[in-house]
Amino acid sequence: MEGRRVRGLTRGLIGAILPVQCAGCRAWDEVLCPSCRSLASSPAHVASIDSARGPLPLVTMGDYDGPLRRIVLAAKHSARTDVTDFLDEAGARLGTALGGVLGVAGSPAAAVGSLAGRVPSTGSAVDVWVVPAPSSWKRRLRGRQVALPLARAVARALAASARPGVRVQVVDAVRLRVGATSQSGKAGAQRTVGRMGSMRALAVPPPDVLVVAVDDVVTTGATVREMERVLGGLDAVATLCRPGLIS
């Protein structure tokens, strides 16, 4: 809470000198207006995404369109836009939904599916790695990462909502290889080719660990498939948004 107060005071001082616009709808005098901020507290959607090993559960806040798309772009590219609270709230929704998807939720009513053969019976210990998609060295240097803070929020909520015996940790386990280029502005085929062989693993999870990949946007799934390759497999994906109809 103290961090939120400090961020609020800082935004107020900056706003008094330099007018701001809502990152989502461009309304004046708000970094995020109440309507756009509420997108982070809407229910998460559970869908699926194709991977090299078959469909993976995909938990997302919505489509890559409208205010949600503009908020993500501002988080990645605007030095004046602080959407930390938005990422925290959205991550909490995603993490809570993941508990049901993975079959580790503390409440039986929260379960929407489980990973047959992967999740031990109730009472057994379960380890979950929450792995953020890798950022370029430039984005890391500028402090404009989105996947890492989102992954931390996802992990906190997943741990808080999980049954006893479930251990959740954020593992920043994947890096882009030298020479890997940005995916921004690329078409589907270019994205797929651009991500093939572009990553390396700093750590590989043991076979009995559940692995969740977290990214700000999932488009063609090229990043997910490359993370799956270097980590030896994934069990679910969490993202702020994805293109197309949520089903």
Can you annotate each of these PLM segments?
Residues 1-247:
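Glycine-rich phosphate/pyrophosphate-handling loop used in enzymes and phosphotransfer proteins
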